[in-house]
Amino acid sequence: MNDFGNFFKNATNFEPYDFQKKFANDDALPDIINVPTGLGKTECIILGWLWKRYNEDKLHSNCYTPRRLIYSLPMRTLVEQVYDKVEEWIHKLNLQKEFLLFKIIGGESDEDWDLYPEKNEIIIGTQDMLLSRALNRGYGMSRFRWPIQFGFLNTDSLWVFDEIQLMGGAVKTTVQLDAFRTLFGVSKRTKTIWMSATTNIEWLETVDSPNINDKAILRLTPADLDNKHIISLTKAKKNLQFMEFDTKELSDTAREIIKRHKAGTRTFAIFNTVKKATDISKAIEKMKPGFPVILIHSQFREEDRKKNLNRLMTENNAIVVSTQVIEAGVDVSCRTLFTELAPWHSLIQRFGRCNRYAEFDDAEIIILNENYDEINNAKNEEKDLRQSGKKALPYEYRDLKESLEILKGIHQGFVSIETLPEIKLKLNILNHVIRKKDILELFDTTRDISGNDTDISVYVRDRNDFNVQVFWRDIVGKSDEVIDSEDFPAKEELCSAPVSDIRELVKKKITLWEKDWYDGGWTKIRQPERVIPGKTIMISSDHGYYSNYGWDLSSRDKVKPIAHKQISMDASDEEDPNSEGNWKSIELHSDEVVTKAGEILSKLLLSKTEEEYILKGSRWHDAGKAHPAFQARIKLESIKKAGIKLPAKAPKDAWYNPKELIHQKNYRKYFRHELASGLLAINNGEPDIVAYLATSHHGKVRVSIRSMPNEMIPVDMNKKFARGLWDGDVVPSVNLGGGKTVPSTTLNLDLMEIGGGTTGKSWVSRATKLYNDPEIGIFRLSYYEGIIRSADRRASGGLA
């Protein structure tokens, strides 16, 4: 297929617009796509990228298109619809083998995208899930996989941020990340594209990326402006009207919405909060209008959210009550639109849902105004704005007043995309801009001494979008302190809930649980401040808090847990399930991982130096399994029967269970074989980067070496110890394959200390030097970690 027009039409059944062809065929990628709503920005990006990657062998190397497309949406409600659309395109083009498709909205079921760094992938997700991973603090996933996804998302990736006017302060984070990749360097090209119908280029100005005038912008071309279909869409008229709205008299509003609904069409009613939308939906249903009432917001479990979205797309005679989640990514049209007053960029998006296809001659938009007089008379003094602020939530009064002034200039009458005034919009962003110091600190994934992680919510969410993910399980009769038997939730189980609601439950002594990554269980949350955005929290199904209307703090009905498959996490610091499998010696397994890493590298075409780092790190990664503390976990009689010297892998029944293990002579709680691997590499003269990569390949020991709570302590109190290793431990000689045999080695833990003692440099100083090295840096280092981890997992699991 050598023509993008045919390629596009085969996927969509439509001819591409000229701006879409320009994106696909130009060598250079734009920085910004600024095209009116409803004209196919999503098709432009997805199909344009597919076309470029499909024909990559025909392009010059300096036109390289990143192999991962990261498509970020501001709200999870939209992810499924875009995912389904892209899946359909890939099937129509018969590209399922060449392009892998994933979605990230919480839960672990789609997290295996990081197994294949050499393959073409499209990853669709919400900005909080994607940006948290790009900042090395991935929401809703194993903390031990943070570094892999940090490395992969910041390398060889084309980031696309859709509807950036809805992103809040996260816009600045995306710009800073783009600047950091230039500052620290990456192994493969990574690019960012920002998209919106209402983009103000000044939104993309930050302290580390000040040259906004250098941004290349893709707009409608002259050919597009003469296109009859585009002209009809941009001129499609809507009759603009105003109506008073009182939350104390919802029945009046509900009655008017029903009255204005025209049979055989959709009516949208968009409200600014979940509570208002839910209350109006209930009020309309109570009046039994005789046609479907569909509620759309962000606080449903996946099955209910999908069901509602499917009804939205298929019901042609319905009232759809929604929050602002419908502003972006939903390709659907209505005849009648009710909307609360909102910031102007939001109103433009909402207006774009009305008469979207120019199919109505009598389309109408009704502005619902709850506080018209207060907004109109509000002064601009900070004190006045603060006092009025609560009534305007989740927005600010100044934004609503600005919209009101614009609307007053339009008056009541007909409006269209073409006639809406172009206003240079500002984003109200809190003063939380991530800086170089912050991203360097986030590279270290070790918790602080209190067991807490850095709260990155101010960098990845809209300022009013502070939510956690909750799920329900039947846990009656189990301990309310620690629960070991419940696995991590699948994405189907998760529901978004406000942080404020969950903190209130903790204050009321309602038992809730959070994941304990040290010991692997779920522990009771005792302090409200432990509840931070992005956390995953378990609730007893007996407590309630969920109904047909989604997350519902007032509901006490038992919640039916979602049937789920067990999710494989990366275990706790104590566990090492990846070592279960067919019998394999350290020599054989090391050879397999090096071979697999070589196969991956053959597709990535990195520099020879980088390949050497990765292959050496792979060779040394399991050297520490020769340590007696690791070998003590496997039954001696099983080892003898198998005839394997120093096994790296053993079948499940060959391992001692936890109760048996604690009685074994060389057992060490929290033992980490990969730290032993790194120490062996250093003690045997390997470069620091090889030691680091060997140590970091499970994501559990990286920049810091710190002993664990309840760790076994040597009898000699003067001995240094950490992660099950004691100063002076002797590791027997071990064959690593590839002609590399490590002699018997006495481990030296002096590098735990500042200055490093007899080793010359501490572990922290070695790691810090690596990520400050301009030839390596934080993104390359994590990328190397990820490749070794992928090779190890694929070799261990027999995956191609």
Enumerate the predicted regions with their spans.
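Interdomain hinge/linker at the junction between the two RecA-like core domains of SF2 helicases
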Residues: 189-191, 195-261
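Conserved Walker A/P-loop ATP-binding site and its immediately adjacent core
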Residues: 64-89, 128-129, 274
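SF2 helicase catalytic motif II
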Residues: 128-132, 137-187
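C-terminal helicase lobe and adjacent C-terminal extensions/tails of nucleic-acid helicase motors
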Residues: 255-256, 262, 279-289, 295-310, ...
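Conserved pre-motif I regulatory segment
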Residues: 1-34
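Divalent metal-dependent catalytic cores for phosphoryl transfer on phosphate-bearing substrates
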Residues: 379-403, 605-798
